[in-house]
Amino acid sequence: MCNEYGFDGVDMDWEHPRVDGPSKDQYQELILYLADALHAQGKLLTSAVVSGVSADGNIYYDAAAHSDAVLNAVDWIHVMAYDGGDGERHSSYDFAVNSAAYWCGTRKMPAGKVVLGVPFYGRPGWAGYGDILAADPDAGNKDHAMVSGMDVWYNGISTIEKKAAYARNNLGGIMIWELTQDTDDSGKSLLSAIGRGIQ
């Protein structure tokens, strides 16, 4: 499929069912098989991974599912540094830095193989950034807004720029979840904020 459609490779985002216990070995076997097959064709294999640590510092069980063999087999990892907790803990700047520190420090991943993930949505519930802006036109200038009578926490323009600059200076790159949740207004766009942050 990669060759047929001209893809650069495959990103493995395995979230369910949990990959721990006996299935951890099966997951490792799958990743090693895919890595061999893709690398033989000059293709990439990347993996989305949990942040590694929760907003209150606890290690996520999922992080251990990515064995050293798996981490060595992939070309880079996409650290999902969001959904770290309720309220402002969902995806703060500090949470992103701590997530990167877990993978680079505790797990010894080379920084160039660690890609920082940022959300284009808010919690609790699920509110895309564009929808948040529709509810509060000033939402881009902060990380908290009221949407349908509910407190929603997300990353505004300043936080996204700061995270992008951190990724530029310390990591292998930045990724988003996900593009359709942004706004078409280039002056308030989070994708535009990333562009400014990585310059």
Please provide the spans of the model-predicted regions.
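Short acidic catalytic loops
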Residues: 2-19, 46, 77-80, 173-177
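Surface-exposed alpha-helical segments enriched in charged/polar residues
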Residues: 3, 32, 36, 101-105, ...
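Short loop/turn motifs at secondary-structure junctions
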Residues: 6-8, 73, 110, 170-171
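Substrate-binding cleft of secreted/luminal carbohydrate-active enzymes
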Residues: 114-199
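Substrate-binding surface in catalytic domains of secreted glycosidases
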Residues: 16-138, 144-149
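Short, acidic/polar
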Residues: 1-4, 57-70, 154-168
